[in-house]
């Protein structure tokens, strides 16, 4: 998933949600764009690399809803 959304050649990248936390290709979490709670699936199209804090804070929210509610800079990744 890292390679698809960030690129195999990149070793670090900012979180897709907060756009602040630096993640490493070896240390990141997987967040659902559409939450499992809302019948989101485990396909690569529905998953994004995000930081631990965003993943835990998001809970069962959909990713875009979480980003908008928290007024996070990561919204640019979804427009």
Which residue ranges define each predicted feature?
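Short, charged surface segments at domain edges that flank catalytic/cofactor-binding sites
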Residues: 1-17, 74-78
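Short coil/turn linker and secondary-structure boundary residues
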Residues: 13, 58-61
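Short, cysteine/histidine-rich loop/knuckle motifs that typically chelate Zn2+
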Residues: 16-19, 53
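Histidine-centered nuclease catalytic patch
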Residues: 19-49, 60-65, 69-70
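A generic secondary-structure signal for well-formed alpha-helical elements
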Residues: 54-58, 74
